[in-house]
Amino acid sequence: VKQKTTNNAKIADHPILMATLYNYFAAEYQALCYQAYNVAKERTILLHKTFPKKKNMAIVLDIDETVLNNSPYQAKMIQINAHYDSCWNTWCRQADAKPVPGAVSFLKYADSLGFNIFYVSNRKEKAVK
């Protein structure tokens, strides 16, 4: 006899459930984000002081989960029992992702010091603009 899988069982088995819950509810998530960007800020200050006349310094970051938090997208994937590719482009076009804690202030500060900022992404070109 094959038992019918309930939606709750599918949700519990979804591969990104724990990571998504962590991003939503763990105090450590926000603290670690701020810590990472504070360390990055310290490094940019050090580089700027060490090489004050250098004009070509750059910061390169990935967009998703480094600058933008896609937890709402991940939660939706869990809720509808879907996986990454099925509606990623739709999510990107909606432009609903919020910044990762600390990202905006760090990037504004780095920009004010004259750092060139480059973003890496697997998003389609239309979704990045």
Describe the predicted segments one by one.
Residues 56-67, 127:
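Acidic helix-start/capping segments at beta-turn-to-alpha-helix junctions
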Residues 22-33, 89-96, 118-124:
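Second-shell loop/turn segments in exported
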Residues 50, 56, 67-98, 105, ...:
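Active-site neighborhood of HAD-like aspartate-dependent phosphohydrolases
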Residues 65, 103-129:
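Substrate-recognition element of Asp-dependent hydrolases with the DxDx(T/V) motif
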Residues 1-61:
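Non-catalytic pre-domain segments flanking phosphatase-related domains
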Residues 7-8, 23, 38, 56, ...:
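Detector for Asparagine
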Residues 33-43, 99, 103-106, 127:
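Stable alpha-helical elements in mature extracytoplasmic
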